[in-house]
Design a protein with these regions (language model features):
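Cytochrome P450 catalytic-core helices
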Residues: 17-21
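Phosphate-handling active-site elements
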Residues: 24-34
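Acidic, carboxylate-rich catalytic segments that either coordinate divalent cations
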Residues: 30-31, 39, 44-53, 57, ...
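Single conserved hydrophobic/aromatic residue that forms the stacking wall/gate
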Residues: 2-13
Length: 176
């Protein structure tokens, strides 16, 4: 189990959102052209471009569908930082993807419950603006989650490996 967790973690962050965004920056010529952005994201969902997995990384969450409350708070800080760092053009691209991706996902995947950016959508952009070396993105990603992962694992051990979601309320009797 540890092998898979550590291997997955090693691939997780840098390869997903930041590499996807770099790919979009390189292949979408006019970042302000909604149709061009939508067309490229459509090809991404169809598995024709980027890593060919048919995913738009940073979009969607297992529990939060209408919005990820963590992302809403984080985004306001990202906008201020982008303005202070002169990265408004990049921020506009993120905003465009945030607007277009849910429409495309609903259309192509027939997911109508709602899809929104998750908290990781902007994380790499922030690390980049702060001048943090890309080699540290994955450790930062992990550090931010270790307490939650640990608590989740303890709950799994006590709850017989049942999947636990944040919106659920435990009905188990308290253990003494």
């Amino acid at each position: 189990r540890d092998y898979y967790a550590s291997r997955g973690l090693g691939d997780v962050y840098k390869r997903q959102v930041m590499q996807m965004m770099n790919d979009i920056r390189e292949n979408v010529h006019d970042w302000s052209d909604r149709d061009e952005v939508k067309s490229y994201l459509g090809k991404m969902l169809d598995g024709q471009v980027f890593d060919k997995k048919g995913l738009i990384y940073g979009m969607g969450h297992a529990v939060y569908s209408l919005s990820d409350p963590r992302e809403r708070v984080f985004r306001s800080y990202v906008e201020h930082l982008a303005e202070a760092k002169g990265r408004q053009k990049d921020m506009n691209l993120y905003n465009m993807i945030e607007e277009v991706a849910p429409e495309l996902i609903a259309e192509k995947r027939h997911i109508f419950k709602g899809v929104s950016p998750n908290v990781d959508f902007y994380s790499g952009f922030v690390y980049e603006m702060l001048g943090i070396p890309s080699e540290l993105y994955t450790p930062l990603f992990a550090i931010a989650r270790i307490a939650g992962w640990s608590a989740h694992r303890l709950e799994e051990l006590v709850g017989c490996n049942k999947i636990i979601r944040p919106a659920y309320k435990s009905v188990m009797e308290e253990l003494e």
